[in-house]
Amino acid sequence: TRVVHLSGGCVMFANVETAATLGIPLLTLLVVLPLVGAVMVSLMNKAQAEQIKLVALVFSLVTGALSVYMLAKFPSGQAGFQFVSQQSWVSEWGISWHLGVDGISLFLVVLTGVLFPLVIIGIDPHHDQKPYLAWMLLLEAGVMGSFLSLDLFLFFVFFEIVLVPMYFLIGNWGYDQRVYAATK
Protein backbone atom coordinates (compact mmCIF):
# COMPACT_ATOMS: atom_id res chain seq x y z
CA THR A 1 0.00 0.00 0.00
CA ARG A 2 1.24 3.46 -0.84
CA VAL A 3 -0.11 6.67 0.66
CA VAL A 4 0.06 9.88 -1.36
CA HIS A 5 -0.55 13.20 0.41
CA LEU A 6 -2.57 15.79 -1.47
CA SER A 7 -3.27 19.29 -0.13
CA GLY A 8 -3.20 18.35 3.53
CA GLY A 9 -5.45 15.31 3.08
CA CYS A 10 -4.37 11.91 1.94
CA VAL A 11 -5.61 9.42 -0.57
CA MET A 12 -4.68 5.79 -0.14
CA PHE A 13 -3.70 3.67 -3.13
CA ALA A 14 -3.49 -0.07 -2.72
CA ASN A 15 -2.26 -2.75 -5.09
CA VAL A 16 0.01 -0.52 -7.15
CA GLU A 17 0.83 -3.33 -9.57
CA THR A 18 0.54 -2.48 -13.24
CA ALA A 19 -1.45 -5.59 -14.11
CA ALA A 20 0.45 -5.43 -17.37
CA THR A 21 -0.72 -7.07 -20.55
CA LEU A 22 1.87 -6.78 -23.29
CA GLY A 23 3.70 -4.30 -21.03
CA ILE A 24 0.76 -1.88 -21.00
CA PRO A 25 -1.14 -1.32 -17.74
CA LEU A 26 -4.62 -2.85 -17.72
CA LEU A 27 -6.49 0.43 -17.15
CA THR A 28 -4.59 2.12 -19.95
CA LEU A 29 -5.62 -0.73 -22.26
CA LEU A 30 -9.27 -0.20 -21.31
CA VAL A 31 -9.01 3.36 -22.59
CA VAL A 32 -6.62 2.91 -25.53
CA LEU A 33 -8.18 -0.17 -27.18
CA PRO A 34 -11.45 1.57 -28.14
CA LEU A 35 -9.41 4.55 -29.40
CA VAL A 36 -7.33 2.29 -31.63
CA GLY A 37 -10.53 0.61 -32.82
CA ALA A 38 -12.08 3.98 -33.65
CA VAL A 39 -9.04 4.95 -35.71
CA MET A 40 -9.02 1.60 -37.53
CA VAL A 41 -12.74 1.82 -38.30
CA SER A 42 -12.28 5.39 -39.56
CA LEU A 43 -9.51 4.27 -41.92
CA MET A 44 -11.44 1.34 -43.40
CA ASN A 45 -13.22 1.44 -46.76
CA LYS A 46 -16.91 2.32 -46.39
CA ALA A 47 -17.89 -0.54 -48.71
CA GLN A 48 -16.63 -3.12 -46.20
CA ALA A 49 -19.63 -2.76 -43.89
CA GLU A 50 -19.42 -6.26 -42.38
CA GLN A 51 -15.67 -6.00 -41.78
CA ILE A 52 -16.13 -2.58 -40.19
CA LYS A 53 -18.71 -3.96 -37.80
CA LEU A 54 -16.49 -6.97 -37.03
CA VAL A 55 -13.44 -4.81 -36.27
CA ALA A 56 -15.50 -2.54 -34.00
CA LEU A 57 -17.03 -5.55 -32.27
CA VAL A 58 -13.64 -7.22 -31.70
CA PHE A 59 -12.15 -4.10 -30.13
CA SER A 60 -15.22 -3.60 -27.97
CA LEU A 61 -15.34 -7.28 -26.95
CA VAL A 62 -11.67 -7.30 -25.97
CA THR A 63 -12.26 -4.16 -23.90
CA GLY A 64 -15.26 -5.81 -22.28
CA ALA A 65 -13.32 -9.01 -21.60
CA LEU A 66 -10.53 -7.01 -19.95
CA SER A 67 -13.07 -5.24 -17.75
CA VAL A 68 -14.55 -8.59 -16.66
CA TYR A 69 -11.01 -9.89 -16.04
CA MET A 70 -10.39 -6.85 -13.84
CA LEU A 71 -13.58 -7.64 -11.91
CA ALA A 72 -12.36 -11.20 -11.34
CA LYS A 73 -8.92 -10.03 -10.16
CA PHE A 74 -10.17 -7.10 -8.06
CA PRO A 75 -9.10 -7.56 -4.41
CA SER A 76 -12.36 -6.56 -2.72
CA GLY A 77 -10.91 -6.75 0.79
CA GLN A 78 -8.44 -3.91 0.22
CA ALA A 79 -9.20 -0.23 0.61
CA GLY A 80 -8.18 2.38 -1.90
CA PHE A 81 -7.76 2.44 -5.66
CA GLN A 82 -6.60 -0.72 -7.42
CA PHE A 83 -4.67 -1.34 -10.64
CA VAL A 84 -3.27 2.19 -10.41
CA SER A 85 -1.41 3.50 -13.43
CA GLN A 86 0.39 6.83 -13.14
CA GLN A 87 2.68 8.58 -15.58
CA SER A 88 3.70 12.23 -15.53
CA TRP A 89 2.15 14.10 -18.44
CA VAL A 90 2.57 17.87 -18.03
CA SER A 91 4.68 17.99 -14.88
CA GLU A 92 4.90 21.80 -14.82
CA TRP A 93 1.16 21.96 -14.14
CA GLY A 94 0.92 18.79 -12.07
CA ILE A 95 -1.04 16.96 -14.77
CA SER A 96 -0.51 13.23 -15.04
CA TRP A 97 -1.97 10.17 -16.72
CA HIS A 98 -3.38 8.79 -13.50
CA LEU A 99 -5.89 5.96 -13.67
CA GLY A 100 -7.31 3.77 -10.93
CA VAL A 101 -10.42 1.83 -10.05
CA ASP A 102 -12.31 1.48 -6.78
CA GLY A 103 -15.34 -0.57 -5.80
CA ILE A 104 -17.83 1.91 -7.25
CA SER A 105 -16.13 2.68 -10.55
CA LEU A 106 -15.34 -1.02 -11.02
CA PHE A 107 -18.97 -1.88 -11.69
CA LEU A 108 -19.44 1.13 -13.96
CA VAL A 109 -16.40 0.07 -16.00
CA VAL A 110 -17.66 -3.52 -16.26
CA LEU A 111 -21.14 -2.30 -17.21
CA THR A 112 -19.60 -0.12 -19.92
CA GLY A 113 -17.45 -3.01 -21.14
CA VAL A 114 -20.46 -5.33 -21.38
CA LEU A 115 -23.00 -2.89 -22.88
CA PHE A 116 -20.95 -1.41 -25.72
CA PRO A 117 -20.47 -4.74 -27.57
CA LEU A 118 -24.23 -5.31 -27.27
CA VAL A 119 -24.88 -1.89 -28.81
CA ILE A 120 -22.52 -2.71 -31.67
CA ILE A 121 -24.23 -6.07 -32.24
CA GLY A 122 -27.63 -4.36 -32.32
CA ILE A 123 -26.73 -1.64 -34.82
CA ASP A 124 -29.36 -0.94 -37.46
CA PRO A 125 -27.89 -2.13 -40.78
CA HIS A 126 -29.64 0.71 -42.63
CA HIS A 127 -27.50 3.33 -40.91
CA ASP A 128 -24.14 4.47 -42.20
CA GLN A 129 -22.14 2.08 -40.02
CA LYS A 130 -18.62 3.44 -40.42
CA PRO A 131 -19.01 6.83 -38.70
CA TYR A 132 -21.53 5.42 -36.22
CA LEU A 133 -19.16 2.69 -35.05
CA ALA A 134 -16.17 5.04 -34.97
CA TRP A 135 -18.12 7.47 -32.77
CA MET A 136 -19.31 4.58 -30.57
CA LEU A 137 -15.75 3.38 -29.97
CA LEU A 138 -14.58 6.91 -29.22
CA LEU A 139 -17.50 7.24 -26.81
CA GLU A 140 -16.51 3.96 -25.14
CA ALA A 141 -12.95 5.22 -24.66
CA GLY A 142 -14.21 8.48 -23.18
CA VAL A 143 -16.62 6.77 -20.81
CA MET A 144 -13.93 4.33 -19.65
CA GLY A 145 -11.50 7.18 -19.12
CA SER A 146 -14.08 9.20 -17.20
CA PHE A 147 -14.71 6.32 -14.81
CA LEU A 148 -11.01 5.50 -14.37
CA SER A 149 -9.31 8.91 -14.22
CA LEU A 150 -7.86 10.05 -10.91
CA ASP A 151 -6.47 13.33 -12.22
CA LEU A 152 -8.96 16.21 -12.46
CA PHE A 153 -7.56 17.52 -15.74
CA LEU A 154 -7.59 14.02 -17.23
CA PHE A 155 -11.20 13.56 -16.09
CA PHE A 156 -12.11 16.84 -17.81
CA VAL A 157 -10.43 15.68 -21.04
CA PHE A 158 -12.28 12.36 -20.99
CA PHE A 159 -15.58 14.03 -20.16
CA GLU A 160 -15.14 16.34 -23.15
CA ILE A 161 -14.25 13.33 -25.30
CA VAL A 162 -17.62 11.84 -24.29
CA LEU A 163 -19.49 14.98 -25.36
CA VAL A 164 -18.14 15.08 -28.93
CA PRO A 165 -19.34 11.61 -30.04
CA MET A 166 -22.62 12.09 -28.18
CA TYR A 167 -23.25 15.27 -30.19
CA PHE A 168 -22.69 13.49 -33.50
CA LEU A 169 -24.50 10.28 -32.51
CA ILE A 170 -27.60 12.15 -31.35
CA GLY A 171 -27.44 14.71 -34.17
CA ASN A 172 -27.01 12.17 -36.98
CA TRP A 173 -28.79 9.05 -35.75
CA GLY A 174 -31.35 10.37 -33.29
CA TYR A 175 -35.05 10.61 -34.00
CA ASP A 176 -37.44 13.58 -33.96
CA GLN A 177 -35.85 16.86 -32.88
CA ARG A 178 -32.41 15.24 -32.82
CA VAL A 179 -30.55 18.41 -33.79
CA TYR A 180 -32.25 20.29 -30.95
CA ALA A 181 -31.43 17.46 -28.54
CA ALA A 182 -27.79 17.32 -29.66
CA THR A 183 -27.25 21.03 -29.02
CA LYS A 184 -28.88 20.99 -25.55
Per-region residue spans from a language model:
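Alpha-helical multi-pass transmembrane bundles of energy-transducing inner-membrane proteins
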Residues: 47-50, 134-138, 142-184
